[in-house]
Amino acid sequence: MMYVLDTNVVSELRKIQVGKADSNVAAWTQSVDASELFVSAITIMELELGVLSIERKDITQGTLLRIWMEQHVLPEFSERTLPVDTVVALRCAQLHVPDRCDERDALIAATALVHGMAVVTRNVADFQPTGVTILNPWEWRIHTCSE
């Protein structure tokens, strides 16, 4: 199985090195090969927005997050960042009819659906209406939209 990591999962992965990550998330991460883990360009955007926001408020923490982003996230996912292309955009549009959902989440879900992947997230409720397969590593079980 291949996975698209939501922003909250990538953020949690940062905590593993310092022993502050949720134990279920850390265990799940150890159970999968890194080559199976992807991010959407939307996740990269959300992470960058977060770093920029913190840099404006707290220089020290912002610097640490900037280093994490530039030395870990971007290099680690350089070959595993999925773009929002025409096919993903069209699939995202379909997810908005008849129930409008958050566009960022819909783009991540559409990316996973187009590529036949599961979304890994803590925000299960945000993705359930899309029909994408969801894995919550905090609970480490797969949810489907029929649950």
Label every model-predicted segment.
Residues 49-54, 63, 75-120, 147:
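Active-site neighborhoods of divalent-metal-dependent phosphate/nucleic-acid chemistry enzymes
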Residues 14-17, 51, 96, 131, ...:
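Short, flexible helix/strand-to-coil boundary loops that buttress conserved ligand/catalytic motifs
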Residues 1-2, 109, 113-147:
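Acidic, PIN/NYN-like endoribonuclease modules and their adjacent C-terminal/linker elements
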Residues 40-42, 84-86, 122, 137:
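Conserved beta-strand termini and adjacent loop/short-helix elements that scaffold enzyme active sites
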Residues 1, 27-30, 72-73, 81, ...:
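Short secondary-structure boundary/capping segments
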Residues 1-39, 53-70, 141-147:
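Short, well-structured N-terminal submotif of metal-dependent ribonuclease cores
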Residues 10, 44-47, 89, 127:
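A generic structural signal for short hydrophobic patches within well-formed alpha-helices
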Residues 6-8, 46, 105, 123:
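Acidic active-site catalytic centers that drive phospho-/nucleotidyl reactions
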